[in-house]
């Protein structure tokens, strides 16, 4: 209780603290409110400097959605795929950085970049949850406006597949109408994949890798090689002696595991929305995507688990 005649507001009865002053009597703190210096001293005038939107080129990004149908749900479809392309751009950037690091025998930076790619793929997996809010009826209303465009025509996704070792010369054809893009995709097809460079790393570390595995036709998909598996077997049996290679192996398994999850969610989302209809690009749709689930990117790393 307050003493008689004491009109001061009471503080906490247990701490003996003074009560806060009423708002209209609160002391002024410079820069704590809107004024000439801005809100909490934040800069508000960007007429002569770069703003957040300027730095991110938001005008270009946010003006890149152009629905062709009158259907409300097409905006979701467009943004889902555009954001996926942005994440794939970052995944390619990180993978190529990791590849350069492996070539230079700088493995710790490569581990960081590979871990980031795995997290990017997790982000892409979660993105399917947003697209799956589209019902079959909603997709059917906008599908005629898509023409023959299809996700398998994504030149960034194709480069990602090639960089991870799933090579297919036929997949150049969808980009023949764009010579600049075709050149990018072809260069990735004809270069060693990330795993090819890791196998070369094994050879540099003294493991006897077959010469035909080290110098092969890079445009062809990888096949299981006994000498590569034997090298990984030694690494897994004696991880303390080959710690960097052991960590590299596990980073690659993490990466392929995340990629498999992305593929699986792709299949289930397609089945949920269009069932087993033919894809807009002419593929069989869900059956084609299910077949892709059987693709193994780093075969020796999976088979060695049985051998151990």
From Swiss-Prot:
Q: In which pathway does it act?
A: Amino-acid degradation; L-tryptophan degradation via kynurenine pathway; L-kynurenine from L-tryptophan: step 1/2
As to how many cofactors bind and how, the note says:
Binds 1 heme group per subunit.
Taken from the UniProt record, the cysteine pairs bridged by disulfide bonds within this chain are: none
Q: Which reaction does it catalyse?
A: L-tryptophan + O2 = N-formyl-L-kynurenine
- Detail which positions bind substrate: 77-81, 139, 143, 280
Superkingdom assignment: Bacteria
Quaternary data: Homotetramer.
Record-stated family: Belongs to the tryptophan 2,3-dioxygenase family.
Function of the molecule: Heme-dependent dioxygenase that catalyzes the oxidative cleavage of the L-tryptophan (L-Trp) pyrrole ring and converts L-tryptophan to N-formyl-L-kynurenine. Catalyzes the oxidative cleavage of the indole moiety.
What HAMAP family does the database record attribute to this sequence?
A: T23O
Q: What is this protein called?
A: Tryptophan 2,3-dioxygenase
| Organism the protein comes from | Burkholderia ambifaria (strain MC40-6)
Gene that encodes it: kynA
């Amino acid at each position: 209780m307050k003493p008689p005649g004491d009109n001061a507001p009471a503080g906490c009865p247990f701490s003996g603290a003074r009560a806060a002053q009423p708002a209209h009597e609160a002391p002024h703190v410079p820069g704590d409110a809107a004024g000439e210096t801005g809100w909490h001293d934040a800069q508000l005038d960007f007429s002569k400097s770069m703003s957040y939107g300027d730095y991110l080129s938001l005008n270009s990004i946010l003006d890149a959605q152009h629905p062709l149908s009158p259907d409300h749900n097409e905006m979701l479809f467009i943004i889902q795929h555009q954001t996926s392309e942005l994440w794939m751009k970052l995944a390619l950037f990180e993978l190529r950085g990791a590849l350069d690091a492996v070539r230079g025998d700088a493995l710790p930076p490569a581990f960081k970049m590979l871990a980031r790619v795995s997290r990017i793929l997790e982000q892409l997996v979660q993105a399917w949850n947003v697209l799956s809010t589209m019902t079959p009826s909603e997709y059917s209303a906008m599908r005629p406006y898509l023409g023959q465009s299809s996700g398998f025509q994504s030149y960034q996704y194709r480069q990602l597949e090639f960089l991870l070792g799933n090579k297919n010369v036929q997949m150049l054809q969808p980009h023949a109408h764009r010579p600049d893009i075709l050149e990018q995709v072809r260069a990735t097809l004809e270069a060693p994949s990330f795993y090819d460079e890791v196998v070369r790393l094994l050879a540099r570390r003294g493991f006897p890798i077959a010469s035909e595995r080290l110098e092969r036709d890079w445009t062809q998909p990888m096949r299981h090689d006994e000498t590569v598996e034997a090298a990984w077997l030694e690494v897994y049996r004696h991880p303390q002696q080959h710690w960097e290679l052991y960590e590299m192996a596990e980073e690659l398994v993490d990466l392929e595991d995340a990629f498999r999850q992305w593929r699986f969610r792709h299949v289930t989302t397609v089945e949920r929305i269009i069932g087993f209809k033919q894809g807009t690009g002419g593929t069989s749709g869900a059956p084609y995507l299910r077949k892709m689930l059987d693709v193994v990117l780093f075969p020796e790393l999976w088979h060695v688990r049985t051998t151990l």
